[in-house]
A protein has these predicted regions:
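Structural signal for the C-terminal ends of transmembrane alpha-helices
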Residues: 72-83, 143-150
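Hydrophobic alpha-helical transmembrane segments
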Residues: 58-78, 93-94, 134
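A juxtamembrane structural motif centered on a specific transmembrane helix
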Residues: 108-158
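Hydrophobic, glycine- and aromatic-enriched re-entrant/interface helices and adjoining loop segments
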Residues: 1-64, 86-90
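Transmembrane helix-bundle signature of multi-pass membrane transporters/permeases
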Residues: 54-57, 97-101, 129-132
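Hydrophobic alpha-helical segments of membrane proteins
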Residues: 29, 62-69, 101-110
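Loop-to-helix entry and N-terminal half of a specific, functionally important transmembrane alpha helix
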Residues: 81-120
Length: 158
């Protein structure tokens, strides 16, 4: 990952094409389904770990910042629930899920932009993949359940 140009047709191919696609998106992107790197098969398996590259090429910097802001909102909701939770389990669970989402997002974005090696970390709730998506949805459901149980006990005691 430090020098993908050394093996541009082998191990560095995916990362080089990812950087080209991210850079070609510019500020506003090329438009929905108009990405040349993505749809001319220069970037293989774009729907999996490199979905952020596809978003960057088609929707540009504005689209990528919108996705990042949505993730920050979701992570901040997890931390807000941990602060408001009455039970220690709900607090620990919410902090853990929020931290896990934060690490996944940072690692995926760093991976597709060349700051970290490509290791196969999906972008939560966006990348194609069954087991990772299922695990993330279940963990968010547990956080929402912890928040709901805290509110139900408040209503019951009132």
């Amino acid at each position: 990952f430090l020098n993908p140009e050394a093996d541009a047709l082998g191990r560095g191919y995916q990362l080089i094409q990812s950087k080209i696609a991210l850079g070609s998106g510019g500020l506003t992107g090329k438009g929905f389904l108009e990405g040349s790197q993505s749809y001319l098969q220069y970037l293989p398996e774009k729907q999996t770990d490199f979905i952020f590259t596809l978003i960057g090429e088609e929707f540009g910097f504005i689209g990528t910042m919108f996705i990042i802001l949505l993730f920050l909102l979701l992570i901040s909701v997890c931390f807000y629930i941990s602060i408001k939770s009455n039970h220690i389990f709900g607090r620990i669970l919410s902090i853990g899920v929020g931290s896990n989402l934060f690490i996944y997002v940072i690692m995926n974005i760093s991976m597709v932009s060349g700051l970290m090696p490509v290791v196969g970390i999906p972008l939560p709730l966006v990348s194609y993949g069954g087991s990772a998506m299922l695990a993330i949805i279940i963990s968010i459901g547990l956080v929402l359940n912890a928040e709901l149980n805290g509110n139900l006990k408040k209503l019951h005691n009132a």
